[in-house]
Amino acid sequence: MAHSVKIYDTCIGCTQCVRACPTDVLEMVPWDGCKASQIASAPRTEDCVGCKRCESACPTDFLSVRVYLGAETTRSMGLAY
């Protein structure tokens, strides 16, 4: 599946998205840009199933992690125009 996962600098380093991901797409990496000194990273996007649990778990109201579904998935879900 060709989904993309974007992590934004609004990440507060809480690890909620990492713990919510059923396929271990996300991991925490060191980053000096926030209080927690870590940020979510998505090194294994090829394993993303598009469930968006990471988005739902994010306490910053979807501002830090976003899953963009691939074209094949949006077509099969009837979301494509």
From Swiss-Prot:
Superkingdom assignment = Eukaryota
Spell out the reaction equation it catalyses. Answer: reduced [plastocyanin] + hnu + oxidized [2Fe-2S]-[ferredoxin] = oxidized [plastocyanin] + reduced [2Fe-2S]-[ferredoxin]
Q: Does the keyword Plastid apply?
A: yes
Q: Which GO terms describe its biological process?
A: photosynthesis; photosynthetic electron transport in photosystem I
Cofactors: [4Fe-4S] cluster
Q: Which InterPro entries did the record assign?
A: 4Fe4S_Fe-S-bd (IPR017896), 4Fe4S_Fe_S_CS (IPR017900), PSI_iron-sulfur_center (IPR050157), PSI_PsaC (IPR017491)
SUPFAM superfamilies named among the record's database cross-references: 4Fe-4S ferredoxins
* Sites where the protein binds [4Fe-4S] cluster 2: 21, 48, 51, 54
Q: What is its main location?
A: plastid
| The record's free-text note on cofactor binding | Binds 2 [4Fe-4S] clusters. Cluster 2 is most probably the spectroscopically characterized electron acceptor FA and cluster 1 is most probably FB.
Give me the Gene Ontology terms describing cellular component: chloroplast thylakoid membrane; photosystem I
Class in the EC hierarchy, top level:
oxidoreductase
For [4Fe-4S] cluster 1, which residues are the binding ones?
A: 11, 14, 17, 58
Q: Which EC numbers does the record give? A: 1.97.1.12
Molecular function via GO: 4 iron, 4 sulfur cluster binding; electron transfer activity; metal ion binding; oxidoreductase activity
Pfam families reported in the protein's UniProt record: Fer4_7 (PF12838)
Q: Where are the transmembrane segments?
A: none
Which PROSITE patterns does the record cross-reference, listed alphabetically?
Answer: 4FE4S_FER_1, 4FE4S_FER_2
| Protein topology in the membrane | Peripheral membrane protein
Q: Where in the cell is it found?
A: Plastid, Chloroplast thylakoid membrane
Q: Per the database record, which ranges form the 4Fe-4S ferredoxin-type domain?
A: 2-31, 39-68
What task does this protein carry out?
A: Apoprotein for the two 4Fe-4S centers FA and FB of photosystem I (PSI); essential for photochemical activity. FB is the terminal electron acceptor of PSI, donating electrons to ferredoxin. The C-terminus interacts with PsaA/B/D and helps assemble the protein into the PSI complex. Required for binding of PsaD and PsaE to PSI. PSI is a plastocyanin-ferredoxin oxidoreductase, converting photonic excitation into a charge separation, which transfers an electron from the donor P700 chlorophyll pair to the spectroscopically characterized acceptors A0, A1, FX, FA and FB in turn.
Q: Which PANTHER family match?
A: PHOTOSYSTEM I IRON-SULFUR CENTER (PTHR24960:SF79), PHOTOSYSTEM I IRON-SULFUR CENTER-RELATED (PTHR24960)
Q: How does it assemble?
A: The eukaryotic PSI reaction center is composed of at least 11 subunits.
- Provide the protein name: Photosystem I iron-sulfur center
Q: Which organism is it from?
A: Physcomitrium patens (Spreading-leaved earth moss)
Q: Which gene encodes it?
A: psaC
